[in-house]
């Protein structure tokens, strides 16, 4: 049996990891914080030594150094590759005017989406610290995207930069809206803020999807991913598909392609 690949997605809020076998199946997964204060270290004690680590890191140099230390402690000398966006890879063509400016997480997510939904036009909406949208044609061409503040960031910005509005987390907002989803307008300030920011997310997605379908004159599958996807999905009036492992799946494909060329 060939050695597995260790895949690491270091996002703006947390770090997710997976172990992928030779068939690119994610056989073990987990998550941990950027710092020890953010939670325990990853539970890698019983993992077999991987062939190498493939990393998407959009969280910065400090997180990169933490990952290096964790890897060196568990598997000294383990080969590792921090991916960068390319003009083309794994069947996806990068439409950015400067391809390397595209975040490595978005690039890996596009590759994962292309493999999960081959030969389909896609709008991929990922809900994290930022909300990102990617337009991917059925032939693998990424034609561009959008970046907006995420749901939590929208609410935090309003709480921080106004005198009378509360600062809400997504957990608080979800609780407030649990019994109010059927109401288009809310009757107190916390719920109004929660729902307003939620509808801003949903409105962005629906407008982008309609514009894309009109421009391409073809059906477009809407794919949702990320931590806030459940709440935003409930506010959408469009059919959609949930997939929460696009980035890790894309990393598995990148690792497999590179290993095949060794």
Swiss-Prot record:
ATP binds at residues 9-16, 129. Keywords: ATP-binding, Coenzyme A biosynthesis, Cytoplasm, Kinase, Nucleotide-binding, Potassium, Transferase. GO terms for cellular component: cytoplasm. The active site is at 105 (proton acceptor). Substrate binds at residues 96, 103-106, 189. One of its GO terms (molecular function) is ATP binding. It is found in: Cytoplasm. CDD domains: ASKHA_NBD_PanK-III. It holds the Pfam family Pan_kinase. It is an enzyme of class 2 (transferase). A monovalent cation. Ammonium or potassium. Its cofactor is NH4(+); K(+). Pathway: Cofactor biosynthesis; coenzyme A biosynthesis; CoA from (R)-pantothenate: step 1/5. GO terms for biological process: coenzyme A biosynthetic process. Its EC number is 2.7.1.33. Gene3D superfamilies: 3.30.420.40. It catalyses: (R)-pantothenate + ATP = (R)-4'-phosphopantothenate + ADP + H(+). PANTHER family: TYPE III PANTOTHENATE KINASE (PTHR34265:SF1). Catalyzes the phosphorylation of pantothenate (Pan), the first step in CoA biosynthesis. Belongs to the type III pantothenate kinase family. Homodimer. This is Type III pantothenate kinase. The lineage of its organism: Bacteria, Pseudomonadati, Pseudomonadota, Betaproteobacteria, Burkholderiales.
